[in-house]
């Protein structure tokens, strides 16, 4: 580059070259500023249209910043994966696939639309992979799209390649372990991380992630030990522990900790104010212990004392509180008085209670409300089928069971053995497995036939 500039200078055209660069730079800045204004003013569609127009009119004025803005715009307007692939193709065409910020943004975009395969393609084609932000984006993409096994595998590869860790990437890895219930693996990751980088041991966010992993995995004793050992605590620390107790059937411990949270923490000389997430844990604890009046009091306190606006989760907890206590009428009235439109989760909570208490009339009404939102959930048919069965309405039950058989999908679960995550499927989910199941059944049939021919008594020793 220096040789070219010297040559231009010797020819006396360097001033013209400077003018061209200045013109090019000014045009790009104006274009990028316009895109930024559209994005900040909440008009992502206009920004994307403007970007496409400018590219068609004068492709040379599109720089890496323009492309970066276009990706952000696509993410902001929840664009389709096709839009992302078009920008992805442009990135390749312009040779920007070595720009980490662009590649990281593309990974984030594909993750937001659930297209993890394309996100991985972007990751793999990035020539320089020493940037921790890129690894974090890809591992987060797997975790956010319910592919925690791949997230852990990629984290292990990152460790093997000696990429410098930070608190964020370890937090994401612990989140993946929490999703899988892989406590041992999470503990190993945390231990290795603080050995490689000692200051991570003082990272409160990271310790909160470890606490959250214990909580999600039902390890409340380990969670409480970590909680008590933490010199510093914030609202997330308390909220995670309150949630942990509530989720694992220790409602009284959850409510006691909530009371302690609101008193002065002598070690920090501060009062930790609960947030909206904290109240979800508190309401869950009230629900699981049948404390209807206390739950109603906390729900009111959240609004009046802490000026917090209830979200769907809070309304859902209140409906669950009424339903668990058998107050179906109160639950129904509460739903009808909600300031927001109730979602299927809230209606299904009431439907489950109708099934438990055999309330056919209310159950049928609730199912109609659910079908207005979603007709494909198998559990809705099962719940109503159980209601019919409890009342001896066998014809209606039979119709519901027929619908269930047509819609049922196999479930999945995971188990940690050593340092390996194993996946199990409740039924065959592809043709190969169906063939294998058929072969196993045939072999079993032959064995039974042979045993019978030799006068063996199945299930007894000879």
From Swiss-Prot:
UniProt repeat feature PPR, residue ranges: 63-98, 99-129, 131-165, 166-200, 203-233, 234-268, 275-310, 311-341
GO MF annotation terms: RNA binding
Biological process (GO), any one: RNA modification
Keyword annotations from UniProtKB, A to Z: Repeat
Location of region: Type E motif: 346-418
Stretch list, region Type E(+) motif: 419-452
InterPro entries (alphabetical): E_motif, Pentatricopeptide_rpt, PPR_At4g14850-like_plant, TPR-like_helical_dom_sf
Pfam family membership, one: E_motif
Stated family: Belongs to the PPR family. PCMP-E subfamily.
NCBIfam families: PPR
Record's protein name: Putative pentatricopeptide repeat-containing protein At1g74400
Organism, scientific name: Arabidopsis thaliana
